[in-house]
């Protein structure tokens, strides 16, 4: 297994996952010594900086221990790892990966719960919502289309502008921290509308995700979202 240099996921996270897989499948047994960082860099054709970042993640996760002069040793078997996508949102994920992202805001408007039914979302009927439609691009290439419904009972008087959303993470603007989400993911072929928005062919598979996002300590979602994403980005979520 090699790192994918065309992927949006940082190389060090890919390398972290690869090593975790090798530990889980027994290629690197518990107590075994890992190759040196220079050997890893040569094997995977990555820089030593990338390897050091992956090593730091592995050490912080308690998966390996490293002593100067004696190398690195596998000290625990990871139960599961995930990389590429978190509950913080795609903008923050990619900013943390030092990837420049462009937000193209298509619409911001008040909506009612029944308006979300066309997007396959079931929202509490008595609440009011702020709807956001946007496209995300990397290097001028669209990769994600989102239809977001924000429950205004969490954000009384909320006003958002396209200009603010183009340059700042939505969660930063809302001043919220999410600690959990419920997602239903399915593979689809794009509609004509999605082909146009994402500039893709009709036979290009997409992942369609229905998501409910929760604030820490809250029982009801503050955000309901239907988003479509190219598998090159989201496909790196493996398991927990």
From Swiss-Prot:
Repressor recorded as keyword: yes
GO BP annotations listed: negative regulation of DNA-templated transcription
DNA-binding region: 37-56
Keywords associated with the record: DNA-binding, Repressor, Transcription, Transcription regulation
Coiled coil: none
Keyword DNA-binding: yes
Database matches in PROSITE patterns: HTH_GNTR
Domain HTH gntR-type: 9-77
GO MF term list: DNA binding; DNA-binding transcription factor activity
Disruption phenotype: Null mutant gains the ability to efficiently use exogenous aminoimidazole riboside (AIRs) as a source of thiamine.
Functional summary from the UniProt entry: Represses the expression of the STM4065-STM4067 operon.
Name of the protein described by the UniProt record: HTH-type transcriptional repressor STM4068
């Amino acid at each position: 297994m090699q790192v994918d240099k065309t992927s949006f996921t940082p190389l060090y996270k890919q390398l972290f996952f690869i090593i975790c897989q090798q530990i889980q499948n027994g290629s690197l047994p518990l107590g075994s010594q890992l190759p040196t960082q220079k050997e890893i860099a040569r094997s995977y054709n990555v820089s030593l900086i990338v390897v050091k970042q992956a090593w730091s993640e592995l050490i912080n996760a308690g998966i390996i221990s490293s002593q100067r002069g004696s190398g690195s040793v596998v000290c625990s078997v990871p139960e599961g790892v995930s990389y590429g996508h978190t509950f913080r949102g795609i903008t923050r994920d990619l900013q943390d990966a030092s990837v420049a992202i462009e937000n193209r805001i298509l619409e911001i408007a008040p909506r009612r719960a029944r308006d979300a039914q066309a997007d396959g979302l079931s929202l509490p009927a008595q609440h009011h919502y702020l709807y956001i439609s946007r496209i995300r691009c990397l290097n001028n290439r669209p990769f994600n289309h989102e239809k977001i419904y924000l429950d205004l009972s969490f954000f009384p008087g909320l006003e958002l502008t396209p200009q603010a959303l183009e340059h700042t993470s939505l969660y930063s603007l809302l001043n919220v921290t999410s600690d959990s989400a419920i997602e239903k993911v399915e593979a689809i072929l794009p509609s004509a509308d999605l082909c146009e928005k994402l500039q893709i062919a009709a036979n290009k598979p997409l992942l369609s995700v229905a998501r409910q996002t929760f604030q820490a300590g809250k029982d009801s979602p503050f955000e309901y979202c239907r988003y479509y994403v190219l598998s090159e980005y989201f496909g790196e979520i493996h398991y927990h």
